[in-house]
Amino acid sequence: MNISSVCIQNFRKLYQCHIDFSNDTTLFVGANNSGKTSAMDALGKFLAGRPFAFNDITISNRELINQIGKQWETVACEKPNSLSEWGNLLPSLDVWLNVNPQDIHYVVGIIPTLKWRGGRLGVRLIYQPRKIEGLFTEYREAFFSARETEKAGAAEKKIRLFPNSLCEYLERYFTSSFVVKSYILDPEKFDADSPQETAFGMECLVDNPLTGIIRIDTIGAQRNLSDPEKHDG
């Protein structure tokens, strides 16, 4: 069994990045600011449980998230019951494995159908709202409370209170409002250039079914060991 490829979406500058893995060693090579570090950070955060930050959301998606917030700020807005609006905005990692029949016992939690007999298997890990209904309610309570307080103090001094937008709210409550969830992918729909839509109804029974299968170790850069421009002092 080995990792055949990964696809990183909506993570920092990596809007959609497909990476093929070799059977032995895979090296990321590229110019500065080309996304090498972002790719490695995505692997560490999704597969090793390292903490996310609001800045991990692709900048171009933040205005779209604020547009969702604008809808939520209307009094008559109905509580959402799905993540359909968020599907193309959230950081995600697709992991595609090549699994031999003798290794099936390692991946029983992500086998898509009883007809599967080996070969490609895929899992999508998404950093998503823990409960979209709860985020909706909590944001509206904070937003409307801030606006009421502003009105009450408007006669004395014009003030602007937190939160003014959904992104501003998430910057403060990101890790408490979001969590990694995993979804089984359909091997027959694999396309390196066009990732399949998330089937939110196919959530795995465990948050990370790849725990125990994939291990992430990081060796920090030892710049001073070989830097010819090293200076003392």
Model-found features: residue ranges?
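Non-catalytic alpha-helical coupling and interface elements of nucleotide-dependent molecular machines
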Residues: 44-52, 130, 224
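Glycine-rich phosphate-binding loops of NTPases
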Residues: 58, 62-90, 96-233
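Pre-Walker A-like glycine/lysine-rich segment at the N-terminus of P-loop NTPase domains
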Residues: 1-49, 57-69, 81
